[in-house]
Amino acid sequence: MAQKPLEGAQLAWMTVALAMATFMQVLDSTIANVAIPTIAGNLGSSNSQGTWVITSFGVANAISIPITGWLAKRIGEVRLFLWSTALFALASWLCGISNSLGMLIFFRVIQGLVAGPLIPLSQSLLLNNYPPAKRSMALALWSMTVIVAPIFGPILGGYISDNYHWGWIFFINIPIGLFVILVAMATLKGRETKTEIKPIDTVGLVLLIVGIGSLQVMLDQGKELDWFNSTEIIVLTVVAVVALVFLVVWELTDDHPVVDLSLFKSRNFTIGCLCISLAYMLYFGSIVLLPQLLQEVYGYTATWAGLASAPIGLLPVLLSPIIGKFGNRLDMRRLVTFSFVMYAVCFYWRAYTFEPGMDFGASAWPQFIQGFAIACFFMPLITITLSGLPPERMAAASSLSNFTRTLAGSIGTSITTTLWTQRESQHHSQLAEFVNPYSPQSQEMYRQLEQVGMSKQQASAYIANEITAQGLIISANEIFWLAAGVFLILLALVWVAKPPFSSGGGGGGGGAH
């Protein structure tokens, strides 16, 4: 941008507005998850049908994120941000008043489409309007909202669905959206980016919609339909692969691509995207797995499972401003290295301590300590990713990097939940082999259970439940071990990035120096 960076109260209010927009969008991607049984029951549908409330949003959102850079070039970043926020608030209201599942799914598609530009543009507008010396602080504050929102989403969603009409899951976006619009209009007035009318890449757009849409539906519905034992999943996979291969070829040869894949010619952009995506895949998979484990094995309610996960957000809130202030004095690769080491430590910690009879603290403490890893994760990796890019490419780079991160989160969720289920089945079979009428240990176990008043059938049911719980814990611990190992491998990848690193953006600091 040619404009002078914002300062003082105007800068502070802009930061709050952009952070709230990010928080609102990320929150909405997880808040409905725990409320699906309530929503489905209220609308006269099954839980499996209700999952389309999540899938529809995810598919539409995944399609719209990568075209944000192209839209911003045509419309302008500020104008696109304001329209996206307004339409998101409107779509939220329409979701809340829906009286059928089909109506709700339709408006969730609209909501997902208009939500796509919010995160990339909030990041781009922050960087382009902050003084160069304070851009690390801007990224740190922005990162805080991306991390905290998915943790509080299930807690808030569970509380609302337990105590109020489920529509309030969506209605809460309306006052936030209005606040964001009013503040953004006041602080970003006259700061519109340069627009450029380019031909519409119709072929690329169609390939993107078909490829990403098929891939996202496949990831969301794969477990429900038993993956590749389902014809539907096989067809979706083939369509996604073919469309995405053609998309890459087309976009690399088209004069006006809808997705600027040439960004991957930058070593730092490629390394940054890989590290963010793979790490976020592991992180997001774990925050989906942990509440399910606590509810299914340890009998936690949805609210208490959310509270056990919530400590992960405490340290980032405290440390992000400090890291943002002093982080630019350090080699960003060192901060990321510390983050990945702490991630590995916490995953190993869980693998060692998760066992039957585990108390609340055993699950909450690793979450709390993992906050160190998260605080040193987003800001330095985004800085590496965007370093050396000119201001006019910031929106496209931000949208593409956020798309890879979002897609990685979906992949992480699918892989984690599928592995957990499949490994549990294997461990259940192995453990059940030790329980048979001829085993002295089994006979003793039945005798002890019958002594406390259980019938033979009750004792068998109790033992079967214990075997299932053991299988779920063992399979979860295997996933934790695997995640820790991948984080240690990622340590080497981040050092392929090449300094110097700047926080991106315009005005005197946008490129490599």
Please report, for each region that a protein language model flagged, where it lies by residue.
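C-terminal membrane-cytosol helix-exit motif in multi-pass small-molecule transporters
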Residues: P175-T193, V210-Q221, V239-T253, L491-K498
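Small-residue-rich alpha-helical segments with characteristic i,i+4
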Residues: S143, I151-F152, S286, S363-Q441
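Helix-loop-helix hairpins in multi-pass membrane proteins, especially solute transporters
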Residues: I65-G204
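Hydrophobic transmembrane architecture of multi-pass small-molecule transporters
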Residues: A9, Q49, F179, R405-P499, ...
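Helix-loop junctions on the cytosolic side of multi-pass membrane transporters
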Residues: L182-T202, V249-V258, E355-P356, Q426, ...
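Juxtamembrane/transmembrane-helix interface segments of polytopic membrane transporters
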Residues: P37, S161-D162, D220, P291, ...
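Transmembrane core module of solute transporters
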Residues: A9-K73, V78-S84, S92, G96, ...
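Residue-level hotspots within transmembrane alpha-helices of multi-pass secondary transporters
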Residues: V34, P66-I67, L121, I151, ...
